[in-house]
From Swiss-Prot:
Protein name, UniProt field: NAD kinase 1
Record carries keyword Cytoplasm: yes
Gene: nadK1
GO biological process: NAD metabolic process; NADP biosynthetic process
Family: Belongs to the NAD kinase family.
Cofactor section: a divalent metal cation
Reaction equations catalysed: NAD(+) + ATP = ADP + NADP(+) + H(+)
Keyword annotations from UniProtKB, A to Z: ATP-binding, Cytoplasm, Kinase, NAD, NADP, Nucleotide-binding, Transferase
Summary of the function given for this chain in its UniProt record: Involved in the regulation of the intracellular balance of NAD and NADP, and is a key enzyme in the biosynthesis of NADP. Catalyzes specifically the phosphorylation on 2'-hydroxyl of the adenosine moiety of NAD to yield NADP.
């Protein structure tokens, strides 16, 4: 593909970030590609994704240097501009970043030469009963986490708004949308609707709706299922619900999840991909659903999601199982699969993938 401008998002606190950023800038100079730093960590002002993308000159490739948190901040910008995103891994327990720092030049070469197929990831978006805002008197109390508070999401001008369908917000989430309590001594009470039908009224510390990508983040920590990022689904999970039913619910991608704060509940904070975006009052509601746009992420080869799951979650074999034998490959990978298996996602004989090739080049 033709790369005309790179937007560079750097987590300066990560070891190796400065060197990796220098490599990206040098590559851009050598290839006559404009490169603009996008500071998502500064607390000197609040900018919408559109404003940040415009200031960076509408990059067609966003490169993030850091961990999953840095990738999420870059994804917010890439989704706004329909740009590709390339995550360089400088983190510790990441599922989103793809490229080890020593391979960043090779990865950029591969993107430039068009030898890679972007991976499409589901995004979430919102409708709400009103605009999301953070009350001025509560702002100081709600400044948790790293990075600046973001401005309230704007209204989407290309969508009908008002009446019983609420306001369409110009915001996307790659991981999750979370509704959480503001008071330490009181849970929030929320009516949960799936595909327009009441599932149940919950009293919980938080309620979240995750994408398959986000299933290994907060949803996983709250007891939710691990979902392949290739799947098309929404995952609803309650955090510390005060009720017998404490299971997650996995919905189809065309089944929206509605969250209405009950009239005598406390207020609730709304976080999108870990960043606080507003506070809702009793009677307010959110509708969370699959966005029409997708995130296009650079993938260097077929993703070994389950190998990464085993590695990053430090999965170990049950001692009783180990005592009973050593697992062997279920199917051989030295020959092509038979016809009835040809449509399945299975290893291809002799094709380790571009990711392995890049790693070997750096060794």
């Amino acid at each position: 593909m033709t790369i005309e401008r790179v937007g560079l998002v750097v987590h300066g606190g990560r070891e190796g970030a400065a060197e990796a950023a220098r490599e990206v800038r040098e590559w851009c100079d050598e290839n006559a590609v404009a490169c603009t730093d996008i500071d998502v960590w500064s607390d000197t002002g609040r900018h919408s994704a559109r404003e940040e993308v415009d200031a960076a000159g509408d990059p067609d490739l966003v490169v993030t240097l850091g961990g999953d948190g840095t990738f999420l901040r870059g994804a917010r910008l890439a989704a706004e501009n329909d740009a590709l995103i390339l995550g360089v891994d400088l983190g510790r327990v990441g599922f989103l970043t793809e490229v080890p720092a020593p391979a960043v030049r090779s990865a950029l070469d591969a993107v430039r030469d068009g030898g890679l197929e972007p991976e499409s990831r589901m995004l979430l978006t919102l409708r709400a009963s009103r605009l999301l805002e953070i009350p001025a008197e509560m702002e100081a109390l709600l400044r948790y986490g790293r990075g600046p508070l973001l401005p309230p999401p704007r209204v989407r001008t290309d969508c009908e708004s008002g009446d019983e369908w609420g306001i369409a917000l110009n915001v996307t989430a790659l991981n999750d949308v979370v509704l959480e309590k503001l008071s330490r001594d009181r849970q929030i009470s929320v009516g949960v609707y799936i595909a327009g039908r009441l599932l149940a009224s919950y009293s919980a510390d938080a309620l979240l709706v995750a994408t398959p990508t986000g299933s290994t983040a907060y949803s996983f920590a709250a007891g939710g299922p691990v979902v392949s990022p290739r799947a098309e689904a929404l995952v609803f999970t309650a955090v510390a619900p005060h009720m017998t039913f404490d299971r997650s619910v996995v919905t189809a991608p065309d089944e929206p999840v509605g969250l209405r704060i009950l009239e005598r509940s406390g207020r609730a904070a709304v976080s999108i991909d870990g960043q606080l975006r507003g506070v809702l009052d009793p009677g307010d509601w959110l509708g969370v659903y699959a966005a029409p746009r997708r995130l296009r992420a650079v993938r260097l080869g077929p993703m070994d999601f389950y190998g990464r799951l085993r590695e990053r979650m430090r999965l170990t074999d049950a001692p009783a199982a180990v005592a009973d034998g050593t697992p062997a490959p279920l199917w051989p990978v030295s020959t092509p699969p038979p016809g009835d298996l040809a449509h399945l996602a299975l290893p291809v004989p002799g094709a380790e993938g571009a990711s392995g090739d890049l790693l070997r080049e750096q060794s």
